[in-house]
């Protein structure tokens, strides 16, 4: 327990001088007791001085304050005591419900599991959302990215996934709110409470108003809690909203530490920082971590270095499209842009694969015909193309679905659709079973039987 003094404060960066024989190691947690502030060592500058990032606001700090070295990295509570609680980056409760009362604490900087410990089995995870289960199925223990610009529904989709999977699979979830709105964190808490799944979710928040050091580490705090559940042999869902803010916090920290920026102003260590987080999100032979990460796409540009770096680590990508959202189709998932490593006949079965490919083929053909329709009208198309267009429009409408978490907005009850019903419905549309039904009957329904019922009512 060596002590040092603050020698320089530049925003969130604090330089601390220690005796030459007691210099803290990289990632050691230091504490300014008088301010109740934790610092994390990022660089050793020489001469006994270390450069640190503050985990809270540095307002009111001054030179000469005493700093104590804890001798180890930041540690957070883990285990069942964290369920139903909201914590900050340091694992302190922020829900006004008293102490966590944990039995054990883990440090947030840990090694990823070794290759021989990792699990290689493939098992599908049913989500109850038609478009996802059909076109970009999730693997249990896989990594999923929800890509989308501002306001296309990343957070709502994520909340629906938590709701469906927590109810259908009764697994444990860890939710890391990284640099998002405090209001969304509040909504999420009450949504989980009302759904009755709060006792299965641990929440860690480092919101928009927090300093960059806090936002950079909060994802690791959540992941550490998820790893503990996995090591106990449980299947865990790890949700991160939003992974882009994690990158952005890294950019801010990098600039404050004086590193030279790389492409588009991002930190030069972007790929490495992303890898450190993503490599730890993996399943072992004892338990699984299935992760769903919302990825904000700046200016709807998927080639931006941040989303592009994230792509490399994912098993499935769910791309949310502004064009589809503008048509009033929610979830606004683009079935042509979204991909999954699991969409393979050897994994999902031949029927599922054929139906998914058929849906994509019909939608792609409709996309190609749109220009002709816009210029010449529908009458100029061949009979075969007219049928394709009619079916594609039905498929587009049928890809929409009322969500449980959006009932207050849509006014219609949420629907969970099993994979079997999803395949049956789309197969029927492709084979022309429902050519006689109006396309509006397919909009915002659950199973295909509801669409038929809706059409018959009219």
From Swiss-Prot:
Top enzyme category: translocase
Gene3D superfamilies with a match to the protein in the record: 2.40.10.170, Bovine Mitochondrial F1-atpase, Atp Synthase Beta Chain, Chain D, domain 3 (1.10.1140.10), P-loop containing nucleotide triphosphate hydrolases (3.40.50.300)
InterPro entries (alphabetical): AAA+_ATPase, ATP-synt_VA_C, ATP_synth_F1_bsu, ATPase_a/bsu_AS, ATPase_alpha/beta_chains, ATPase_F1/V1/A1_a/bsu_N, ATPase_F1/V1/A1_a/bsu_N_sf, ATPase_F1/V1/A1_a/bsu_nucl-bd
Catalysis performed (reactions): ATP + H2O + 4 H(+)(in) = ADP + phosphate + 5 H(+)(out)
Entry keyword set: ATP synthesis, ATP-binding, Cell inner membrane, Cell membrane, CF(1), Hydrogen ion transport, Ion transport, Membrane, Nucleotide-binding, Translocase, Transport
SUPFAM superfamilies the record matches: C-terminal domain of alpha and beta subunits of F1 ATP synthase, N-terminal domain of alpha and beta subunits of F1 ATP synthase, P-loop containing nucleoside triphosphate hydrolases
NCBIfam families: atpD
EC number: 7.1.2.2
Source organism (scientific name): Shewanella halifaxensis (strain HAW-EB4)
HAMAP family: ATP_synth_beta_bact
CDD domains, sorted: ATP-synt_F1_beta_C, ATP-synt_F1_beta_N, F1-ATPase_beta_CD
Record-given protein name: ATP synthase subunit beta
Family: Belongs to the ATPase alpha/beta chains family.
Binding annotation for ATP: 148-155
Pfam families: ATP-synt_ab, ATP-synt_ab_N, ATP-synt_VA_C
Cellular component, GO annotation: plasma membrane; proton-transporting ATP synthase complex
GO molecular function: ATP binding; ATP hydrolysis activity; proton-transporting ATP synthase activity, rotational mechanism
Cellular location(s): Cell inner membrane
Tree of life domain: Bacteria
Function summary: Produces ATP from ADP in the presence of a proton gradient across the membrane. The catalytic sites are hosted primarily by the beta subunits.
